[in-house]
């Protein structure tokens, strides 16, 4: 997966 997606999930979680 793209790092941007992981970062987005981290912010949401």
Swiss-Prot record:
Tissue spec. comment: Expressed by the skin glands.
Modified residues (Leucine amide): 13
Subcellular location per the Swiss-Prot or TrEMBL entry: Secreted
Key word Secreted present: yes
Protein name: Temporin-1La
UniProt entry tagged with the keyword Protein biosynthesis: no
TM region(s), chain numbering: none
GO biological process: defense response to bacterium
GO cellular component: a single term: extracellular region
Recorded family membership: Belongs to the frog skin active peptide (FSAP) family. Temporin subfamily.
Function: Antibacterial activity against Gram-positive bacterium S.aureus.
UniProt keyword terms in alphabetical order: Amidation, Amphibian defense peptide, Antibiotic, Antimicrobial, Secreted
């Amino acid at each position: 997966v793209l790092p941007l997606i992981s970062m987005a999930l981290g912010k949401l979680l």
